[in-house]
Each structure stands twice: as C-alpha cells, then as structure tokens.
Amino acid sequence: MAKRPLLLLLLAVWVLAGELWLRTEARASPYGVKLCGREFIRAVIFTCGGSRWRRSDMLAHEALGDVFSDTDSNADSELDEAMASSEWLALTKSPETFYGVQPGWQRTPGALRGSRDVLAGLSSNCCKWGCSKSEISSLC
C-alpha cells in the first residue's frame, strides 16, 4: 500500500514538470522571431511601411485634384513639350552630372557596400537566433 501514494506523488511531479516544460517552450524566444529569406524581407517591408508612401502620394493627389480642375488643354501640350526637352537633355548629360553624384563616391565603392553588409549580418542573425521588431526597424 505504501507504493500507491508514492506512485501518485511521482505521477503528480511528472505532470507538473511536463506542464512547466510546455510553458517554457510556448514562450517567445528572448531574441524575437526567427525569420529567414523571404519572410525576413517581408518583415522589413512591412515594418518600414513601403505602401505608406503610395497612400500619402494618392491622398496628396486627391487633395490637389480640385485645385487644377479648370486648366486649359494648351497647358497639357506645353507640359508634354517641356518633358520631351528635359528627357532629351537627360540623354545628352552623363549620369553623374544629371543625378548630381558626388565625385567622392566613385573613389570609395566600399562605402556603399557597408549598408548591404549590415543587412546581410542582420538577416543571418535573424535567421539563426531571431530578431525583434526594433532590430528590423533599424534598417528603415
């Protein structure tokens, strides 16, 4: 008969230990969520809010739509001519002159590569150990 209470006590300890183990497994990792590949890129785009820019452009366009509703058709043709001439001018200039690239950038190709290295490091760490939303938002 002494075996029965001991067996029940052992069973109770085993159930409580199993429940405790399940609780620790269900908790989020202290490093955040593990994201690899496409999931990481999607999380960066979602966190940085790429579509927010398009929404703000559309709202600004709708707000200005009523202001320019009574323009004449001659202005449209003048705008087309101006765009054609600016496109022609863009083709005649070098890309550095047209875009205003600073000459120092041409001498240091590694300077632009630094941000890619940060992205690669964070993406590999996020895949291995997980990362938080604040770490992902540091890329914005």
Swiss-Prot record:
SMART domains: IlGF (SM00078). PROSITE patterns: INSULIN. It is found in: Secreted. CDD domains: IlGF_relaxin_like. Residues 56-116 form a propeptide. One of its GO terms (cellular component) is extracellular region. Keywords: Cleavage on pair of basic residues, Disulfide bond, Hormone, Secreted, Signal. Disulfide bonds join 36-127, 48-140, 126-131. Residues 1-26 form the signal peptide. One of its GO terms (molecular function) is G protein-coupled receptor binding. InterPro entries: Insulin-like, Insulin-like_neuro_ligands, Insulin-like_sf, Insulin_CS, Insulin_family. Pfam families: Insulin (PF00049). Belongs to the insulin family. May play a role in neuropeptide signaling processes. Ligand for LGR7, RXFP3 and RXFP4. Heterodimer of a B chain and an A chain linked by two disulfide bonds. This is Relaxin-3. It comes from Sus scrofa. The gene is RLN3.
